[in-house]
């Protein structure tokens, strides 16, 4: 009997201790949760936007001297959708939205010489200055490519935007050269592996492919395409300019372009190849310039989506133009609106300052495409 009573007492004692430990554990858990929730409550939440009924209009404002103008507010902007003024929203914390960037690089057509490791090519490539050519001849080595510093600059951009980068290359076909990554060293390493392509420059196909890559990214990310190419399309087969424009207008991505003219290099190569005494066809540059005026594909795509387009002729101008464009990407006002009259189809957009200022220049997308599912 005594053993039975003693066992009961021991059991109750053990249960009481367990209950005390449980209450203490619950109290500690409650304290931890309250601290975590308090900290989380103080953190700014990233902006989550549905593209079904919100049109993003990243707007760049520069002075006439080219400096980015800051300190404007949402009330300073007017957005008109097909002539109807809209209610403008300005994202006050753009740093909370990481960037997904696709860099599409032309390696075919006249860009292919950039990736051939032969010293003599630098003599006839328009990307190289005369001083660079002279130095290359002395050292008997290939000149550095115009985009030799791209890896370092992409690393800086990724660090400043908390972003991810993917690489696409193209000639007559399009290739995913590097999937999305936050590892800047991986991007730099892949850029050293660029090789020359064929005689194509399928710009429309490359933009189409890159846009679909960006569409696969989470909706809370800013999506940007940077196109590095010549101006004219050579050999696209998967899309047309009209359908691509519609596709881009229905998206909320930003497109910028860095273009070079292949004419100077082509004329130098043609002159080098001419037998002595043969006449040079002076109509060639005229025909080329007329065609370029009709088919400035890269610049036109950037203009529709409000992105900047810049030109380069060598490494120095490439570095400067790249820096200007990426500064403009980071320095944009992230404006948006919910359409009041979202009829399916194309809608022209006009962005302006409420109080007109002649010292400022605005750059923003010029249209969007409303789809059927918009309420």
Model feature map: region roles:
Residues 16, 25-28, 66, 354:
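General helical structural elements
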């Amino acid at each position: 009997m005594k053993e039975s009573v003693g066992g009961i007492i021991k059991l109750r004692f053990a249960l009481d201790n367990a209950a005390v430990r449980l209450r203490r554990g619950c109290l500690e858990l409650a304290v931890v949760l309250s601290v975590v929730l308090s900290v989380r409550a103080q953190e700014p939440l990233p902006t989550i936007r549905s593209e079904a009924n919100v049109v993003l209009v990243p707007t760049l404002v520069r002075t006439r001297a080219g400096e980015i103008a800051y300190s404007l507010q949402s009330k300073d902007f007017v957005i008109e959708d097909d002539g109807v003024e809209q209610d403008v929203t300005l994202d006050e914390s753009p740093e909370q939205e990481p960037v997904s960037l696709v860099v599409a690089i032309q390696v075919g057509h006249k860009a292919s010489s950039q990736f051939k490791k032969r010293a003599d090519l630098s003599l006839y490539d328009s990307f190289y200055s005369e001083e660079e050519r002279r130095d290359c001849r002395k050292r008997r080595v290939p000149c550095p490519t115009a985009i030799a510093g791209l890896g370092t600059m992409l690393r800086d951009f990724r660090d400043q935007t908390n972003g991810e980068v993917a690489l696409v290359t193209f000639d007559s076909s399009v290739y995913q050269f590097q999937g999305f990554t936050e590892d800047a060293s991986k991007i730099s390493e892949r850029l050293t592996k660029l090789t020359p392509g064929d005689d194509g420059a399928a710009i429309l196909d490359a933009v189409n492919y890159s846009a679909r890559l960006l569409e696969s990214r989470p909706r809370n990310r800013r999506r940007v395409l940077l196109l590095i190419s010549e101006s004219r399309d050579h050999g696209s087969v998967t899309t047309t300019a009209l359908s691509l424009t519609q596709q881009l207008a229905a998206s909320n991505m930003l497109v910028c372009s860095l273009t070079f003219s292949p004419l100077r290099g082509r004329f130098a190569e043609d002159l080098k190849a001419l037998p002595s005494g043969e006449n040079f066809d002076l109509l060639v540059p005229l025909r080329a310039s007329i065609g370029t005026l009709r088919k400035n594909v890269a610049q036109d795509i950037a203009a529709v989506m409000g992105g900047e387009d810049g030109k380069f002729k060598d490494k120095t101008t490439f570095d400067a133009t790249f820096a200007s464009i990426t500064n403009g990407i980071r320095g944009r006002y992230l404006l948006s609106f919910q359409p009041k009259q979202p009829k399916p189809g194309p809608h022209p957009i006009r962005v302006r300052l409420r109080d007109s200022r002649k010292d400022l220049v605005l750059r923003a997308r010029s249209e969007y495409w409303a789809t059927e599912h918009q309420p």
